[in-house]
Amino acid sequence: MDKVKNRLVRKEFVVPFVLVTSLFFIWGFARAILDVLNKHFQMSMDITLTRSSMIQATTYIGYFLMAIPAGMFITRFGYRRGVVLGLTLFGLGSLMFIPGEGLNSFDFFLVSLFVIGCGLVVLETAANPYITELGDPATAPSRLNLAQSFNGLGSVSYTHLTLP
């Protein structure tokens, strides 16, 4: 009896799999660090706990507003372009922190976080199904579970990378 072993990821897709899986780590880290930002904004900008809760709210409003447009974009242009758009928005939102510091404006930081949230939702909307396409359909759930485990790893590791 000849057994054919299904590879989790086809050889030609190892590099894209590793790159996309690293994005799962990055967005896990990005979402988890919101709590750290919350405390720092409270201290450095002397804002209330209630006002600082806008950090999470603004980021997740980006998820709410951008999820359907992200899906439409990915349907029209494909997973890879969706990943590029998500990374572009994520990077743009992150770079907006630089002038935000000079302006010392909490509202400007909230706009930055909204753009980051939009980038994250596009990344997630593109990366999840893209991972399933990188090999045999029979092993797609295993690939997705492996990639998703890096999301949790990113969420947990932020504490070790952000401590003074």
What is each of the regions a protein language model found here?
Residues 16, 22-41:
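Extracytoplasmic
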Residues 1-22:
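Cytosolic juxtamembrane N-terminal segment immediately preceding the first transmembrane helix
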Residues 57-71:
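Central cavity-lining transmembrane alpha-helices of secondary-active solute carriers
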Residues 145-158:
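Glycine-rich segments within core transmembrane alpha-helices of 12-TM secondary carriers
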Residues 89-102:
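C-terminal ends and interior cores of transmembrane alpha-helices
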Residues 107-122:
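Hydrophobic core of transmembrane alpha-helices in multi-pass small-molecule transporters
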Residues 159-164:
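Conserved small/polar residues in nucleotide/adenosyl-binding loops
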